[in-house]
């Protein structure tokens, strides 16, 4: 997937032509299908890549741009359709074993990973049978960032001999997955160690069963397709907060136990012990200057914690978040004595349950030069979760698409989809005026044409609308990621937009070289675009903290302060650019051939409200004033302008050698809470806060956010007709790279694969 031009994956989240930034895997704008059925997790909208039967993949199709007419709201940005193999005349069994290890820089042991894929397909009289299994164990290249999973599944199809063109059957899949996520690092000096503020894992059991029925009447040119699904996921959050005691943490910070009486005295007599030191700086603070005040606080911190680093403060903050309630001036001593005891690790949370029921019907009729497709779909989701609470949703849609071929060269396609969505008691998530009356449905339209200019030469144009409802998780999520929170936003609205494309495709052949070149210009526009906002929040009201008054209110009311993220509508956005790709084969001789794919994508991701937003933020002189992103540029967060990808495979007799190459330009903007790239006369309050939480992230990001090049290499051979061996080295040059702050890509990785077909 990562080698497809125009398709990128960040934190499990796919993005087509810059349509998505960083959302930590929730609420995809790109729909992933396996044999026509979505693998998006109901409720969260995240893509469960582990449910895809990779051991049985036949081909992968990518449709770029809005595809919501046929496929629903999650296809706002594009569609990736994975099609599995069908049984042939002879039974086929495939076994693939792989093992690998991560190279430096991690020093504590040698992290390993390995997996086993099994698949078997055959025909038994009128039955088609396919079964598959996968197991995978990955220690991870980062500390405590592992993945362990087992998946089994299959397909059984019965071709009814009594009715020509009738088949029915069932797809079944089960996945057990035990894994931890990696949100942010501990410090720039320890990038492969989890931050104690954000250390969370899950244990999941996912199961679905998909019954289906297909009937094709070739004489009448009609096809009926019925598909259904029952889905269940049981998910248990495992919180891995630090098990260090307060004694361990403060000892690392250079704290002297004899200073405890001094701390108690300061806490009980702060009016005389602390106020005279800090009060003189109040006039400076009122004028927006905090360097003097922060200097005194730094002296106080160095007095008690002379060897403390930002990572130590992370440990301390995480420890405090897990040790509540905090002391008052009357019980400081007793609280400190109790605090010296080791912290007990949190037990697994209660299991969250998500259920989904899906029905889909599609009818198509072929005419002499055209085809009509109509259908409808219904999905009900019920979530009973500590993460989101109890919520239910209904999604009902009907669609129509008409395709017509004119003069043997021109193909025209038009379609419309009507969609209704409800969450809990919000019965009008969308409203549309039809003949003056408001109805709770959203129509989306799509049209396209493809014209054959000449032999192997085509021009195409398309326009498609998109509409994506926020998932239950995006709207109602409330959870603790080991200290970092995720906060709900009940006011989150659906995002909508449209995509237009003009493209040209030309086949070519020069001697033994043949292939095609494709170039497309695209334009995408969004309204109420949903983005991920990282910062400080009120733990009770979930308000975003963007001023001192809100900060003081969070403390004075007892609500408390949380570090975390929230999904929010950012307004209008547009993304336009050019997508250029070519692929082909050069035949040197009967035994030697070179296959290649090369692609370049230029995207310009624009925040259309940037001028008004910058003016509003510039006018806010509050000491805790927040900005929407790390700079004043016009660009959306977590996007790159340029992307180049190349795949080359040389085959000679039973040997093969190949490489994947990828280059991306720098990330244009990130969250302000992480990095501020603006030039200032002196640091502000947020600069000091970032330094305490994240260390010298500002300089690290400035030095490393300059684009990166990654190269993979593979060498293989066919040992026999049925057995092949392949060795791979990913990140051959061992580049350290990041697409976002506080997340470093995998170092050089060595892999050995052995496969057998019989």
Residue ranges and their predicted role:
Residues 1-37:
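Extracytoplasmic beta-strand/coil segments of soluble accessory domains associated
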Residues 3, 37-64:
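Short acidic/polar hinge/loop motifs at secondary-structure boundaries
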Residues 51-96:
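A beta-strand signature from Gram-negative outer-membrane beta-barrel systems
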Residues 67, 84-120, 133, 138-142:
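Short strand-turn segments of transmembrane beta-barrel domains in outer membranes
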Residues 96, 407-408, 514, 521-525, ...:
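Gram-negative outer-membrane beta-barrel transporters
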Residues 138-149, 159, 163-220, 224, ...:
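Flexible loop and strand-edge segments within Gram-negative outer membrane beta-barrel domains
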Residues 225-229, 233-239, 452, 458-462, ...:
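Membrane-embedded beta-barrel scaffold of Gram-negative outer-membrane proteins
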Residues 369-377, 381, 389-525:
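Structural signature of Gram-negative outer-membrane beta-barrels, strongest in the C-terminal barrel
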